[in-house]
């Protein structure tokens, strides 16, 4: 029997959990021309959700583009990826090359065959520099939208900072503001950076798009999913175990799947029974496997950042009060604020009102057991 749980990759049925309301709302907004800014901490399932939505929209006749800025190392690489995504919707590579070449003068696509004989797109900057204006690249979906509208997704959009971010941001905004047949989705998990781009008056994308925070999946839906996955794969799971998995993982979809998968593997070695002892072994195995990564994360912090992180590990709300500072010997307050801002920017923590949460619950478990 195969493990019924998947993590670490974008998933579809049968591993995709719920999000029915988000699928309906996002699809309706995008089809009406509304652009979106979707944010949440990492591992909440943003990518799986949007890929599923794009798949559905393609079936309805829309053209789609998906660009993950985590993989974009240069302006040239962006142009290559953008052209490649757009060409997927053309009848043939030959027609695609002819069509796009007719619409671009400065940045032209070049098609060659890779080592496996498959077409590969590169670009030729006619001006000789990849610092040339990318406007004609940005404008392609609008120019090609004669019969079909386009949906363009920029994942981890805050990572444009690696591409001379301010200039790239302004160039893109100057183009997309005129696109009447293209809806855009800007997504990101470094929420502090992404929200700054869309909520600060001095930024190019100020108030562009509908802001949407992707929340956690309801725990009852997660519990039903886990119970069904175990039962259908021959695991005798104790009734309270699914809720315990969800609690340990703080209902973060990726980590719920991660622990559920590890517990399934342990149960296979325990006569297909999943109880508290087996779950504890699964947690222990995960922490052991991740120890080098956790140590690296911790050691890259300053001494004060480590001190603040350990305090939040024990108590994660009202962290700027004098009582809190006294309990954990955090002085001065300005240093604590700087350390917290750093922990937010790097994605170790996320903030919900006055509560600060670990984005990786296993990192928190490791800190509590090893450092606190």
Explain the meaning of each model-derived region.
Residues 1-36, 41, 350:
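A short, basic N-terminal segment
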Residues 2-3, 177, 288, 292-372:
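C-terminal leucine-rich, beta-strand-based interaction scaffolds used for sensing/assembly
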Residues 30-31, 158, 250, 264, ...:
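Short, locally clustered residues in the helix-turn-helix/winged-helix DNA-binding domain
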Residues 34-35, 41-44, 48-151:
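P-loop NTPase nucleotide-binding core
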Residues 124-191, 199:
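Conserved Walker B catalytic segment
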Residues 196-247, 269-271:
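Helix-loop-helix "sensor" segment of P-loop NTPases
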Residues 242-248, 254-269, 307-310, 341:
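C-terminal helical "lid" of AAA+/P-loop NTPase domains
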Residues 266-289:
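Conserved C-terminal helix/linker of AAA+ ATPases
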């Amino acid at each position: 029997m195969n493990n019924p749980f998947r993590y670490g990759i974008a998933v579809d049925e049968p591993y995709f959990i719920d999000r029915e309301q988000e699928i309906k709302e996002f699809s309706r907004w995008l089809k009406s021309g509304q652009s979106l800014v979707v944010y949440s901490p990492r591992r909440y399932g943003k990518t799986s959700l949007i890929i599923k939505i794009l798949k559905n929209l393609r079936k309805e006749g829309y053209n789609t583009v998906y660009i993950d800025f985590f993989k974009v190392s240069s302006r040239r690489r962006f142009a290559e990826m953008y052209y490649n995504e757009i060409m997927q919707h053309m009848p043939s590579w030959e027609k695609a090359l002819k069509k796009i070449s007719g619409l671009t003068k400065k940045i032209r696509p070049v098609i060659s065959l890779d080592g496996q004989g498959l077409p590969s797109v590169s670009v030729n900057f006619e001006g000789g520099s990849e610092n040339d204006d990318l406007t004609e690249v940005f404008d392609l979906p609008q120019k090609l939208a004669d019969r079909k509208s386009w949906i363009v997704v920029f994942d981890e959009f805050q990572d444009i900072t690696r591409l001379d971010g301010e200039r790239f941001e302004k160039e893109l905004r100057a183009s997309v503001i005129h696109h009447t047949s293209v809806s855009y989705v800007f997504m990101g998990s470094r929420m502090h950076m992404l929200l700054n781009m869309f909520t600060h008056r001095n930024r190019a994308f100020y108030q562009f798009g509908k802001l949407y925070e992707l929340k956690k999946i309801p725990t009852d839906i997660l519990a039903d999913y886990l119970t069904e996955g175990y039962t259908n794969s021959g695991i005798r799971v104790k009734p309270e175990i699914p809720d315990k998995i969800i609690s340990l993982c703080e209902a973060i979809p990726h980590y719920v799947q991660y622990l559920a998968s590890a517990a399934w593997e342990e149960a296979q070695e325990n006569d297909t029974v999943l109880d508290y002892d087996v779950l504890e072994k699964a947690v222990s195995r995960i922490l052991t496997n991740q120890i080098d990564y956790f140590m690296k994360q911790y050691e890259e912090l300053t001494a004060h950042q480590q001190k603040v992180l350990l305090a939040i590990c024990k108590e994660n709300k009202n962290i700027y009060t004098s009582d809190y500072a006294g309990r954990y010997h955090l002085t001065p307050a300005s240093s604590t604020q700087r350390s917290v801002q750093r922990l937010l920017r790097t994605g170790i923590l996320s903030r919900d009102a006055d509560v600060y949460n670990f984005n990786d619950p296993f990192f928190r478990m490791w800190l509590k057991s090893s450092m606190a």
